[in-house]
């Protein structure tokens, strides 16, 4: 039987273990290990510098930039030990940029305020006033010097609006008018009395000629101007039947050739001439 080959002990130790590991620490006992900084890995000097050369260069550049800005490194950038966190350094760089942008905005706003004259107040928002700037009292009703028109608004019983205008006399006729005529009242002006009576007649409430109602959503007039309420006007327009004596428009269930229930006259259809 052939003996198994004995491993060569003269093989270099760096081929048996990676170069980044510390062979002394691996061969020593746990009791001989030195205390290390928490969160940091012990790496041999041979592997530390090639891996972190660029990071150390960037750190030195950032520290020089902070010193040029006149800011203390103790306030802006904490003192970094042998092991530093690149993420924390990037966050601090963002904070510095944010502070610089805020300072620039503050300076621009202060510069804009200085450009305005010191005595110029800020323009308030324009708002339309609800009342007149110089309100004046209206003319009295019995003022003899009033010239113009007076409008009188009244609501009819059928909820319609009626406007009655009253015009003042011209200046020429007013100057020729004697004081006695002005004091005489309505008796001295028969024309005014007639106009007043015509206005009072117009103020009388409308009444349906068929059902005698005074309230309806819509008034409908017949061909001769006779006022009819909405319901009676629709029936009269549809069937064309009414009493020739009292203008009673029968309901739908009342047949023609019947007598009027109000005056007894026959309800014949109206023949258009």
Curated annotation (Swiss-Prot):
CDD domains: ZnF_GATA. The keyword Ubl conjugation does not apply. GO terms for cellular component: nucleoplasm; nucleus. Pfam families: GATA. GO terms for molecular function: DNA-binding transcription factor activity, RNA polymerase II-specific; sequence-specific DNA binding; zinc ion binding. GO terms for biological process: negative regulation of transcription by RNA polymerase II; oocyte development; positive regulation of transcription by RNA polymerase II; regulation of transcription by RNA polymerase II; spermatogenesis. It is found in: Nucleus. Residues 99-143, 172-201 are annotated as: Disordered. Keywords: Activator, Developmental protein, Differentiation, DNA-binding, Metal-binding, Nucleus, Oogenesis, Repressor, Spermatogenesis, Transcription, Transcription regulation, Zinc, Zinc-finger. It comes from the Eukaryota. A zinc finger (GATA-type) spans 208-232. InterPro entries: GATA-type_ZnF_Regulator (IPR053116), Znf_GATA (IPR000679), Znf_NHR/GATA (IPR013088). Transcriptional regulator that plays a key role in germ cell development. Determines the oogenic fate by activating key genes for the oogenic program and meiotic prophase entry. Acts downstream of bone morphogenetic protein (BMP) by regulating expression of genes required for the oogenic programs, which are repressed by Polycomb activities in sexually uncommitted germ cells. Regulates expression of STRA8, a central downstream effector for the meiotic program. Acts independently of retinoic acid (RA). This is GATA-type zinc finger protein 1. It comes from Homo sapiens (Human). The lineage of its organism: Eukaryota, Metazoa, Chordata, Craniata, Vertebrata.
